[in-house]
Amino acid sequence: MSRFMFSIGTVLRETGQALDRIGCSMQGSNAFREAISKHRTIMGIYEKTPALPRAGFIAPSASVIGDVSIGEKSSVWYGAVLRGDVNSIRIGAQTNIQDNTVIHVAKTNVGGVAAPTIIGDRVTVGHNAILHACTVKDDAFIGMGATVMDGAVVESGAMVAAGALVTPGTVVPTGQLWAGAPAKFMREMTAEEKALTVTSAETYAEVGAVHAAENDKSFEELEYDKAARRMARERDPDYDSHLGIERSQVKVQV
């Protein structure tokens, strides 16, 4: 039944698009063609639909597709693509997938082994990273622009440096920093680097909640914010202080 309704919906949407094209052709040079973005932040495929957290942040420009499961307080940032079409993607709690990261899976590869991508809890995946059919365990850190390939395992608390290439089947042990292309052992992680893996996850969980709230605001709430900012610019802070009004408590009727 669901497939039937989906098919009917597709027909109706395509009919509307066809009518719009006919109307534009009749208007000739006076027609205005508005390009509507077909981007879908959440998209099911092969009868698989992403499972999203109740508390977390999925950026509106991200793409979460297919068999993807994301844990509580995790965040997927702007421009990131999680494509669980030919296999599954599993992401734990309080993990952050930063801007423009690509996460994919494998149905087939050189080893002939189908492989999902599994990411644990409190993992940081830096901007522009690529994770393909690999495993990244709890509290690991993947630097910006790094690539982790099929069958590779980044153990708990390990760190992959920015721009590194972790080749297929490689294991990055706990407490080690790997860098280079191909990635190799550089040294043991410092106490500061180990602390960073924890604070990064906590910070992104907090910031993600702020972004989620801002992106969920209604038109009326946005207009209220604009009016409040305008009043704050126009009214002297000393005036408010004499009235005993704190700026954060100023109420503006829109």
Predicted segments, located by residue:
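Glycine-rich hexapeptide-repeat left-handed beta-helix
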Residues: 20, 24-47, 85, 93, ...
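A positional/architectural concept
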Residues: 53-92, 96-97, 101-107
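Eukaryotic intrinsically disordered, low-complexity regions enriched in proline/serine/threonine/glycine
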Residues: 146, 253-254
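Extended, small-residue-rich solenoid/repeat segments and analogous flexible loops
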Residues: 1-73, 245-248, 252
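Short proline/glycine- and basic residue-enriched helix-capping loop/turn segments at helix->loop/beta transitions
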Residues: 124
